[in-house]
Amino acid sequence: MKNSNSNPEKIYAAEKSRYDEFLKMNLSLDISRGKPSSEQLALSDGLLTALKSSNDCIGISDYRNYGFLDGIPEAKKLFSEFMGIDVDEIMILGNSSLNIMYDTLQKAMQFGIMGNEPLNKQGEIKWLCPVPGYDRHFSVTEEFGIKMINVPMTENGPDMDIVENYVNNDPSVKGIWCVPKYSNPQGIVYDDETVSRFAKLKPAAPDFRIYWDNAYMVHAFKQDLPILNLLKEAEKYGNADIVYMFGSTSKITYAGGGIAFMAASVNNLNDFRKHLSVQTIGYDKINQLMHVKFFNNVENIYKHMRKHADLLCPKFQVVMDTLQEELSDVASWYNPVGGYFVSCDLPEGTAKRTLELAKNAGVIFTPAGSTFPYKYDPADSNVRIAPSFPPVDELKLAMQVFCCCAKIAYYEKNI
């Protein structure tokens, strides 16, 4: 923070006075979740007119009727090209990739994977969790009673020495969560070496799987950063079965109202499909067709995402500018070039207090600790900031409150 070497008591008193002014404003601001703004959602309103009559619902079949358990052919073609995989390596499944991940793990727990013993009959099982990471991932493995192990993130992805040591030597390790492109919350893109090392893993457990969540694969702010295709890399080494890839259009079109997909080897998809055929007759084919008609090709998806970037960039710049102006001396953060979040590391032992003060002032953040398994951040320092939803003026004010609270929490411990 600016002037941190000046009189601490004087700075603390000034920030307390500033905080009191914020309290008088009766604020109600929420930057806790990565929700698209109304302006972003409006970019996809063409979906609502993509189908104009019942005739538009006819493809190789009448898509108003039953059938096509794992997606209509048109959607499979579009999104297999989008994911850079073969058309027989994808399934179109509902509206939520998180739901697919939950379902996939549930099936592994109850039925086992490709003939292996169900996970819930194998005693204690473990899961690798790159940190800081996505809170909803951790909630899934916690719900199933799986022991979660922290793996530190580096600027190139998870610490692969740690990953390889666990996966290649411990048969109780059954999976790892990954957000490989513009990671949640840091915005890191896994480099080629990291992806290649994932593809070359030699798991001690035959039922180990990488849960590769491509939530932000086209969410660049300016120039897109390339990333190796994990499934194709794994195929080179005869290792395709260790990969599950997930994605959705939730932050491309309508949040929670888009379509979601899973990409994997034919072996994995066949294993999943045999249970899926009991679970459902099929998903919303009309919504799938609407997305196909709206986009038509992959290039149009990228053009669409540039419109999102135009709306998001000014908001992320507000966060960067405010952090730099107010907290540069004591806090650290990644300057993301894509994705939906900013990860800020405050002085150790101050994150909870900072967000408590912010909440009392009417500004809500993702709770401290949420970016770690069991909601426990050992350093009590990491805060996830979600700039996407509020208008710029509200975001500026929220960030000012955040920085004020961070300073107060810091000086409470250091005076």
Feature names for model-found ranges:
Residues 93, 235-313:
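Conserved core segment of the aminotransferase class I/II
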Residues 306-320, 331-345, 359:
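Conserved glycine-rich beta-strand-loop-beta hairpin in the small C-terminal domain of fold type I
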Residues 61-206, 217-238, 403-414:
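Conserved core of the PLP fold type I
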Residues 16-24, 268-269, 273, 344-384, ...:
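Conserved C-terminal alpha-helix-loop-beta "cap" of PLP-dependent enzymes
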Residues 2-70, 74-75, 80-81, 360-363:
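N-terminal "arm"/small-domain region of PLP-dependent enzymes with the aminotransferase-like
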Residues 206-208, 212, 225-249, 270-271, ...:
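Conserved active-site segment immediately N-terminal to the catalytic lysine
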Residues 2-12, 54, 67-69, 73-77, ...:
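PLP-dependent enzyme catalytic core of the Aspartate aminotransferase-like
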